[in-house]
Amino acid sequence: MASLLYLILFLLFVCISYYFTYYPTNKLQAAVMETDRENAIIRQRNDEIPTRTLDTAIFTDASTVASAQIHLYYNSNIGKIIMSLNGKKHTFNLYDDNDIRTLLPILLLSK
């Protein structure tokens, strides 16, 4: 009978140890785990949108149109699109209206 009690207490100890090892036991751990989960989702979204190479038309002047090949990268964490054109890097902020007005014709005229 005593050995059965020891076995039950040992299994209870193993279950409690497992709980404290693998589950958050305070608010800080719970917050960190939640933040890590959100960051993993954002990282996965960014990986799903690959760096793209687009053939597009660039308006160098009001009357001049040049065909160019651009490389685009979208980062949803900071809300920016990074465009590489002829070795120059241009960054567009998606929360700025002027940047959106500049970027929209480039994306609409690309294939």
From Swiss-Prot:
Mode of membrane association: Single-pass membrane protein
Pfam families for this protein: Chordopox_G3
Cystine pairings recorded for this chain: none
Superkingdom in the source lineage: Viruses
Entry keywords, A to Z: Fusion of virus membrane with host cell membrane, Fusion of virus membrane with host membrane, Late protein, Membrane, Signal-anchor, Transmembrane, Transmembrane helix, Viral envelope protein, Viral penetration into host cytoplasm, Virion, Virus entry into host cell
Modification note: Unglycosylated because produced in viral factories instead of the classic ER -Golgi route.
Induction info: Expressed in the late phase of the viral replicative cycle.
GO cellular component term of the entry, any: viral envelope
GO annotation (BP), single: fusion of virus membrane with host plasma membrane
Subcellular location: Virion membrane
Listed transmembrane segments: 1-21
Side Virion surface, residues: 22-111
Purpose of the protein: Component of the entry fusion complex (EFC), which consists of 11 proteins. During cell infection, this complex mediates entry of the virion core into the host cytoplasm by a two-step mechanism consisting of lipid mixing of the viral and cellular membranes and subsequent pore formation.
Assembly mode: Interacts with OPG099/L5. Component of the entry fusion complex (EFC) composed of OPG053/F9, OPG076/O3, OPG086/G3, OPG094/G9, OPG095/L1, OPG099/L5, OPG107/H2, OPG143/A16, OPG104/J5, OPG147/A21 and OPG155/A28. Except for OPG095/L1 and OPG053/F9, each of the EFC proteins is required for assembly or stability of the complex.
Similarity remark: Belongs to the orthopoxvirus OPG086 family.
Name by which UniProt lists this protein: Entry-fusion complex protein OPG086
Organism for this UniProt entry: Vaccinia virus (strain Western Reserve) (VACV)
Gene behind the chain: OPG086
